[in-house]
């Protein structure tokens, strides 16, 4: 999530400008992402790589999808 990225960035004392330079994602895109949570998949991937969070990003996309609505209901 955007909040998680912001927290990691701040914990590592990385400014939004520095993250932009590290990731190749524009400062405006990073600022917008941290404010609204909206970002392209490509930019999110670049940010994840720059912050060494690629494994977390991969985990999002490798989760097993639900087979039916009952699985969703059972999980809640």
Descriptions of predicted regions:
Residues 5, 16, 27, 41-44:
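Helix-turn-helix DNA-binding elements, focusing on the entry/boundary residues of the two helices
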Residues 3-19:
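Short basic helix-loop element that most often maps to the first helix and adjoining turn
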Residues 39, 53, 65-66:
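Residue-level marker of structural boundaries
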Residues 24-39:
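Recognition helix of helix-turn-helix/homeodomain-like DNA-binding domains
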Residues 58-76:
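Short, charged recognition helix plus adjacent turn
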Residues 1, 12, 37-40:
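Flexible coil/turn residues that form the inter-helical turn or adjacent wing/linker of helix-turn-helix
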Residues 36-49:
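Short, basic-rich loop-to-helix N-cap that marks the start of a DNA-contacting helix
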